[in-house]
Amino acid sequence: MIETFNTGETQESLRQEYNPDGSVLRKAQLRLLDMAIYLQETAKKIGVPCRLDGGNVLGAMRHGGFIPWDDDIDMVVDYKDFKRLCDYLKAHPHPQYVLQDNDTDPGFYKEWACLRDLKSENRSHDNQQSADRRMHEAQKFRGLHVDIFPYEGNMIPWLQRLAAKLSVNVNLKLAGRYPLLAQIAYKFLHVIVFPVFRLVGKLFGNPDLYMHSYGAWFYEQNPRRCMIPHKDIVFEGHTFEGPADADELCRIAYGNYMDLPPRDKRDRHKIDVVFK
């Protein structure tokens, strides 16, 4: 973590501009942090390695926690452990957080799961007719969430890109408009198509090439050596599992990741958070 960035901004100036104490964004970040702590503690209890991913690894390295303008947490588990973790979370529910997948929410058609907060709501301010908003409002649970992504080796990148496009089409073109068709399409991909892709990967894929599992909407290709075994990383003053080589993972995804992006590239999600 550094104090003064390439733009001349400091950690403190970023905090005051984007997520000062008491702001809605900071409250959301702290709620997400509590959810991530619970998720990792639960995973450890059942022996499932579960680590921070994506922008949260970047945030830990550059800011010691959240990227100041960020409002989400991503965690990943090995594909072979994914169902076991999800099944446990559904069988042993938290009083405030719920595991969201297609079993618990018939309007959720993604190939990953979410841990959702029941005492908040994300309200989209996208255009009412937009596909993103329809997809969001088709879901039963809409609170703050921690994404739980499966990842695996033996991936074939072009098949993953095809899988992602198929899944995106189900979510953006069918969700909220044609729920029965969306459910049929989701099940066809989940039960038939993506397992066939996985079998092809087992036969012809590179065991040292790791990606998010088939159907996730991400395409980063990472060598096995920077993914596993997990190593501890400090995030918002708490110790989480992180990737084996956080520096290499960030360089693959973001290049010179210790530099701040220009202001117009600091992505803020089009969501308002309401606490109940």
Model-identified regions with their sequence ranges:
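Conserved oxyanion/phosphate-binding beta-strand-loop segments in alpha/beta enzyme cores
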Residues: I2-T7
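Conserved catalytic core of two-metal-ion nucleotidyltransferases
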Residues: E9-E12, E17-K44, L89-M155, A182-Y186, ...
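Active-site nucleotide-donor binding segment shared across nucleotidyl transfer reactions
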Residues: Q40-I73, V77, F82
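Short, conserved charged micro-motifs
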Residues: K83-D87
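N-terminal beta-rich core of secreted/periplasmic extracellular enzymes
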Residues: I156-P157, V170
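A short secondary-structure junction signal
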Residues: P157-A164
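Short, surface-exposed loop/helix-turn segments at secondary-structure junctions
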Residues: K165-L166, Y214
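Short, cationic low-complexity segments
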Residues: S167-Q183
